[in-house]
Amino acid sequence: MYFNVEKVVYEGPSSKNLLAYKFYNPEEEIAGKKMRDWFRFAVAYWHTFNSRGEDPFGSATFERPWFKKDPMDTAFAKVDALFEFCEKTGVEYFTFHDRDLAHEGLTLRESNKILDKVVEKIKEYMKSSNVKLLWGTANLFSHPRYAQGAATSPNPLVFSYAASQVKKMLDVTKELGGLGYVLWGGREGYDNLLLTDSALEEKLFARFLEMVVEYKERIGFNGVLMIEPKPKEPTKHQYDFDASTVLYFLKKHNLFEHFKLNIEANHATLAGHTFAHELRVARLNGKLGSIDANRGDLLLGWDTDQFPTDVYETTFAMYEVLENNGLDCGFNFDAKVRRASIDPEDIVYAHVSSMDAFALGLKLAVKLREKVKPMIEERYSEYNSEIGMKILEGKTTLDELSSYVEDLTDVRVKSLKQELLEMVINDVIFGGR
């Protein structure tokens, strides 16, 4: 037993039990769907089972009981820990990079054989468990070979190695029944613009994605392909800067129909956006596929990957998810306990509190939408006028619009009512009305 806790269950808002769900009731129906279907919560293998608590200024602080002397023993023990964790928390999905499951061998062939052994153990567990794979991905950023990029590397052998890793992980994701596959270009970008052939690297990145699409279709993988935007870190400037940048890139290279986005909260703040902003950009373009649920520290300039317990932020996020009628995949907790939180049980506390924060956010977002929709309709109501409809329907010209306003002495705009909106938000969150 790796986690010294009882099974966490829903007990409702009045429960005094800290390790009980107060708001996340997987069977409760909200806005036409069960909570479990709105969320599909997932535990991230890398932060939860791989992290040792290192940071740039200090060594490992986590002595996890699944860390063994032999790397294969560790790999198998991590699988045991995964399924125990999911059983005790009710988390029904997981996500992983290829190198999260097992160490890298001397050759790619050897690495794939090692990976296959761990995948077989996961498949055995899955036969008697409800735990499923949300999405898979390949680690194309940790190994020194990727120091200058993977798909955008100046070395075609590195490009080929990265392509081979993705090929294998598409196979594994399909084999495990994953709902999607994510590509994150942590090393796809530049540190020095003068040393960068930007046109060539853009072409390489597009060609890489074209081959991913071709292979996905050839093997009959029915999951959704997704790109995860991030503006920087580890690269100074990444090509997948934010949702708008990625969507433009996909449009330019005729890849738009093949990909959706996996939006991460902390990546949004690093790009100078709110989490809800990035969700909306993806949603309005029909490209909101999945969410990496976490939060950043606005006073720090790096990816802190904290657990998402801010109910304001979860409410605004769930507003966008409601408007999107859900997600293709789900909510992956790309978050890590703090370096000083050294007990395995801290991982449980973090996930339970975050799942509750999103469940409460969903309930509040339903109420908020009821209050805000009429305010939005009132704000734009003047476009229901004759001239407003002509503008919207493309039935007017600059000449007609000029003649319409040239003799007006005043044009008044209605009050924005932002202060009223802020009152409404607090009334919903704290008053439950």
From Swiss-Prot:
Localization per record: Cytoplasm
Query: How would you summarize the oligomeric state and partners of this protein?
Result: Homotetramer.
Q: Where does Mg(2+) 2 bind?
A: E264, H267, D303, D305
Could you say which cofactors this protein requires? Answer: Mg(2+)
Gene Ontology terms: biological process: D-xylose metabolic process
The beginning of the lineage is:
Bacteria, Thermotogati, Thermotogota, Thermotogae, Thermotogales
Q: Which family does it belong to?
A: Belongs to the xylose isomerase family.
Carries keyword Transferase?
no
The record's comment on cofactor binding reads:
Binds 2 magnesium ions per subunit.
Q: What protein does this entry describe?
A: Xylose isomerase
Q: What PROSITE patterns would the database entry show?
A: XYLOSE_ISOMERASE
Q: Which InterPro entries match?
A: Xyl_isomerase-like_sf, Xyl_isomerase-like_TIM-brl, Xylose_isom_bac, Xylose_isomerase
Q: Which UniProt keywords apply?
A: Carbohydrate metabolism, Cytoplasm, Isomerase, Magnesium, Metal-binding, Xylose metabolism
